[in-house]
Amino acid sequence: TDLGGEELQAAEVTAFTPIDFFGRRNRELKRVHTYIRKKRRKNEMELALLDAFAHYYEQGCEAEQLETAEHNYDYLQREAAEQGKLMHGSYNYHNIVFQGREVVTSNFENAKVGIQIMDLYGFLRKTMEKNGWKQDLGRRMIASYEEKRLLSEEERHLLYTLLLYPEKYWKQCN
């Protein structure tokens, strides 16, 4: 959805920089890893987190490294602000209602001007997690999205990188 005029001036524009995003999360993973490693007594969950750390931390670093100067998302932010591109901010199955052939979206409390692909990312990740990361499902979801709105090369790269990041592991660590 695009906003115009006065609505755009009132809308909050959210800056998103993947390098900062992944870098901050990777530092958090390291901090938690160091904290747990130094503990004398560790519970089963902490031992499992330590055991999996190297694999998921490497995956997180790979996502961070994919974001080079070549893939700078400042222009996606500027484009969102200039064109008033509205993102839901919390687009997931809890906020989607099917009424016959119509789809109704609710709960726009987190809506803001921003990179719209973030909504697809959140919905796709949650749906894929709930369905065992079936690649065919993910491909069909992206193809369905692109029937309405084609992804730019930068958006496609951002989506790939976001999905590469081990978000579930990061959440478990926090």
For the regions a protein language model found, what residue spans apply to each?
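ATP-dependent phospho-/nucleotidyl transfer catalytic cores
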Residues: Q9-L86
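Active-site acidic catalytic loop and adjacent metal/ATP-binding pocket
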Residues: L66-M118
